[in-house]
Amino acid sequence: MKRVHYTDSYLLVPQHPVTVNLIGGGGTGSQVLTNLARLDVTLRALGHPGLFVTLYDPDIVTEANIGRQLFGYSDLGLNKANCLITRINNFFGNDWKAMPALYPSNMKDVRQEHLANITITCTDNI
């Protein structure tokens, strides 16, 4: 049978949590973040080291975000990345990281700390 997909063995049997950069914490990004947290719980229950997610988003929560994204009125004026990561960390007991900034758009500007095993973009503009 022809192999269609390839998964690096490091992702299947890692020694450390798989690092994930999630770029954007709006409508799609907030949902993806929540599901990554649920996936992390499942992976850990199966003996996998789980995930370590860094969320990048420079935006703040506005009234237009309420209802369309996973934010409430108490979140108004807060940075989206800080707000969402704090909520996830408190709920699931994680130590994931918020970066209230844009992800570097030029690869030569990317420092080691910005690299991850998986990068997911959830933005509507660049």
Model-derived features with residue positions:
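Adenine nucleotide-associated cytosolic modules
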Residues: M1-I126
